[in-house]
Amino acid sequence: MNGAKQAPEISVNRAGRQARIVAILSTESVSSQSELAALLAVQGIEATQATLSRDLEELGAVKLRGADGGVGVYVVPEDGSPVRGVTGGTGRLARLLGELLVSSDASANLAVLRTPPGGAHYLASAIDRAALPYVVGTIAGDDTVFVAAREPMTGAELAIALEKLK
């Protein structure tokens, strides 16, 4: 035996497995799918890398690095749900803006938000989920989020509004 205690394998459906993944990612710093598979195995849940990859995508999990560029860890949106306008979305958005927003700029109807490397998708998802009435939508790269303002708001006004939320 390799020393790691492993529970007997149990049969868990997709929803149960994903609930365990959310629980693990909310309490552990997991930097790889193989590490996640090992943590699930300890609980008696066997999952292939392909299955974990699909689960992480469905949960909206992203790998986030700190501003220092250290090792990335998986994070899942607090509610684990891919739906817009979840309860508490603006409170969560305010917290994430405080943690991730490095700077903001604007052009025409776009607010351009800068994050640490790897943070843009997570911030864009939070903006989308908050369902702000003055936001049409977001596009995220690695460290940049374009946020489209709903007319008559300008990108500069939107950038200021988002800065005030943090």
UniProtKB/Swiss-Prot annotation:
Pathway: Amino-acid biosynthesis; L-arginine biosynthesis [regulation]. InterPro entries: Arg_repress, Arg_repress_C, Arg_repress_C_sf, Arg_repress_DNA-bd, WH-like_DNA-bd_sf, WH_DNA-bd_sf. One of its GO terms (molecular function) is arginine binding. The keyword DNA-binding applies. GO terms for biological process: L-arginine biosynthetic process; protein complex oligomerization; regulation of arginine biosynthetic process. HAMAP family: Arg_repressor. Regulates arginine biosynthesis genes. Belongs to the ArgR family. This is Arginine repressor. It comes from Mycobacterium marinum (strain ATCC BAA-535 / M). The lineage of its organism: Bacteria, Bacillati, Actinomycetota, Actinomycetes, Mycobacteriales.
